[in-house]
């Protein structure tokens, strides 16, 4: 039971990209995966969007993504998720982004329902601030939806995925953008009809849908039949609930205009009476220096400028059941095995790092005439000189009990048990600086196995 349970365990793997240690996956799409990461230099959390170079090249999006990343490096607005840097390896592009801790605005609506008008207006004002800033720099979102609106620890809005529209958009010969819709409920009529569209007008429509959801708690356009849904969007078939104020109704109606040429613009939204109530323009420092060297390196072919991807295996963890089983007095294996006068295996604990433990064992075993084979935190030691029962072969593995406590197990895999005991006594003498507590003394009487 004990051995079978351990066999099912597998080593933990730490993956590093440059100075970042990657953690769990927090998002995934067709072209990219987003993983939580930690900057090992300052312990700051970040989110890293990982793109597959082969997929990007296959869809001929390299230059567009490169251009949009360069533009996004210039965007430093308090209501937009920040792009810190870009790295590249032979196979991947890594976009390092600000990690926002407050969750999605979508979750708040899904859990608690609609917002009060004052709160909805505050978030809408912050959304328009972000959209206006990015549009003024030629950056469009084109996939604005509640799920892309995050909140920081202070409850301020942060728009994610701004400027990375190339992952879902393509420019055709007419010079206009074309797309296949990911979330049709938020998408403007001209986008659904794929007739080519202006990115700014499409973003404004999506902002109108978002404002409606914040105030109503549900979408303005919904239908189980996708064709019927498209018809409702194309004709702007929606009604405002009775609790909407007159000012909110007027603004939403002007935003959800199916004709992009007559739809309200951001400059007009900023002058709208309902919008202006309690409005405070954002104040932030735009003085900064931006380098694009990292972008050139990420997309370049020079391997000297590529970031290193490193995989670091961690020792297998032991659970509470296994720790109890290690205690000789409670070792459940003894219930099923004949009494052993001679030990074929032994263990010790160590407070040293696992790599140091493996290195010290190797340094102690080699002078004793042992050939060493290592893989991760497992080691096979074989005596090159044959003994009474052939070559002594010892299997060793390091297990993690806690971050700073490890159990080292040595088992006789082949050869004479007496020779194994003698080897361990000599080895443990050499490992005084590594061994914290031993698994009892090796017994020296009885018949050898």
Curated annotation (Swiss-Prot):
<dbReference type="GO" id="GO:0007165">
    <property type="term" value="P:signal transduction"/>
</dbReference>
<protein>
    <recommendedName>
        <fullName>CBL-interacting protein kinase 31</fullName>
        <ecNumber>2.7.11.1</ecNumber>
    </recommendedName>
</protein>
<dbReference type="Pfam" id="PF03822">
    <property type="entry name" value="NAF"/>
</dbReference>
<keyword id="KW-0418">Kinase</keyword>
<dbReference type="GO" id="GO:0004674">
    <property type="term" value="F:protein serine/threonine kinase activity"/>
</dbReference>
<keyword id="KW-0547">Nucleotide-binding</keyword>
<keyword id="KW-0808">Transferase</keyword>
<feature type="domain" description="Protein kinase">
    <location>
        <begin position="20"/>
        <end position="275"/>
    </location>
</feature>
<comment type="similarity">
    <text>Belongs to the protein kinase superfamily. CAMK Ser/Thr protein kinase family. SNF1 subfamily.</text>
</comment>
<dbReference type="InterPro" id="IPR017441">
    <property type="entry name" value="Protein_kinase_ATP_BS"/>
</dbReference>
<dbReference type="InterPro" id="IPR011009">
    <property type="entry name" value="Kinase-like_dom_sf"/>
</dbReference>
<dbReference type="GO" id="GO:0106310">
    <property type="term" value="F:protein serine kinase activity"/>
</dbReference>
<feature type="region of interest" description="Activation loop">
    <location>
        <begin position="161"/>
        <end position="190"/>
    </location>
</feature>
<feature type="active site" description="Proton acceptor">
    <location>
        <position position="143"/>
    </location>
</feature>
<keyword id="KW-0106">Calcium</keyword>
<dbReference type="InterPro" id="IPR018451">
    <property type="entry name" value="NAF/FISL_domain"/>
</dbReference>
<keyword id="KW-0723">Serine/threonine-protein kinase</keyword>
<dbReference type="InterPro" id="IPR028375">
    <property type="entry name" value="KA1/Ssp2_C"/>
</dbReference>
<feature type="binding site">
    <location>
        <position position="49"/>
    </location>
    <ligand>
        <name>ATP</name>
    </ligand>
</feature>
<dbReference type="InterPro" id="IPR004041">
    <property type="entry name" value="NAF_dom"/>
</dbReference>
<comment type="subunit">
    <text>May interact with CBL3.</text>
</comment>
<feature type="domain" description="NAF">
    <location>
        <begin position="313"/>
        <end position="337"/>
    </location>
</feature>
<keyword id="KW-0067">ATP-binding</keyword>
<dbReference type="GO" id="GO:0005524">
    <property type="term" value="F:ATP binding"/>
</dbReference>
<feature type="binding site">
    <location>
        <begin position="26"/>
        <end position="34"/>
    </location>
    <ligand>
        <name>ATP</name>
    </ligand>
</feature>
<keyword id="KW-0464">Manganese</keyword>
<dbReference type="InterPro" id="IPR008271">
    <property type="entry name" value="Ser/Thr_kinase_AS"/>
</dbReference>
<dbReference type="Pfam" id="PF00069">
    <property type="entry name" value="Pkinase"/>
</dbReference>
<keyword id="KW-0597">Phosphoprotein</keyword>
<dbReference type="InterPro" id="IPR000719">
    <property type="entry name" value="Prot_kinase_dom"/>
</dbReference>
<comment type="function">
    <text>Involved in cold stress tolerance. CIPK serine-threonine protein kinases interact with CBL proteins. Binding of a CBL protein to the regulatory NAF domain of CIPK protein lead to the activation of the kinase in a calcium-dependent manner.</text>
</comment>
